[in-house]
């Protein structure tokens, strides 16, 4: 394998630890592609529930934008978060972060304060992975609908 077997050894150690550990524990793990995980990791008793976290809805996108604006010392109240959230459907949280970073850079190049127009322009320039890989996202959503608990 590309990692020299590190992943296999790591999963083996995790499975052994989960099997041997007798105290009550609450273990949370995340995966971008659950189909790539070994099936023995997914059986009941190891992970009793699998939750599906979809891309952020409008309210979540507004919240994510607010977080990333604040992190960059911007007052989110200066922006029309409703309008901005309408322009970035199917964006992931990390894609929204990059929109804010790129828009701030573009505004700096113009020697103007960051404004909605900069953010919207960056959103229009961004092709989110969910659009570029729409078939894969559709399949993942279908798989999750049949097998997972919605995290919403």
Segments (PLM) and residue ranges:
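C-terminal anion-handling pockets and recognition modules
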Residues: 103
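Walker A/P-loop NTP-binding motif of AAA+ ATPase domains
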Residues: 1-85, 91
